[in-house]
């Protein structure tokens, strides 16, 4: 986005990974949050359809602000239980919590490095925002640091990849140690159109 095309609309597919909340003692911070990050088959929840929509506006000096909404279905919840049947070597187990519906609403401020690296195609970015998640019967706020990469096919059409670490304000555990309000990664891939 830029002053010539300050508005952008994006849409595509999102994936939710709750593995980051299944941390256990004895692991360093990096392993607690990033081990199995790309275990798509076992840990990622993906709806096979358009599942996020965003709108944003350029405000100057590489910064833009935006709102987005997403929907998903959580049929893979990861938690730490080394005594449960089927756990992996680290004691993690994946269960279906009951096909919980996931709805997310997020506000984000993003900084694009495109002008800094003097590119017209490659557009890396960092973002920070806040949001609210509705997960089954629970709802909770999140703080969302993130990173993204957009590849612009033309001046106005691009392919966008992004990830956010949605830090929960309410990691409440039930009697089985399963987190009701999990922090999680949300990854997205889709098309972005900018206009003015």
Pin down the residues of each PLM region.
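Outer-membrane beta-barrel proteins
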Residues: 42-43, 135-137, 176-180
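Residues that define the transmembrane beta-barrel architecture of outer-membrane proteins
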Residues: 5, 46-51, 99-105, 122, ...
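Membrane-embedded beta-strands of outer-membrane beta-barrel proteins
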Residues: 53, 107-109, 126, 145-147, ...
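Transmembrane beta-barrel strands of outer-membrane/channel proteins
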Residues: 11-15, 67-71, 126-132, 147-149, ...
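Predominantly the C-terminal beta-signal and adjacent terminal strand-loop region
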Residues: 2, 20-24, 30, 34, ...
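Short glycine/proline- and aromatic-enriched beta-strand/turn motifs that initiate or cap beta-hairpins
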Residues: 1-56
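Outer-membrane beta-barrel "beta-signal"
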Residues: 8-10, 16, 105, 109-110, ...
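Gram-negative (and chloroplast) outer-membrane scaffold detector with strong preference
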Residues: 56-143, 193
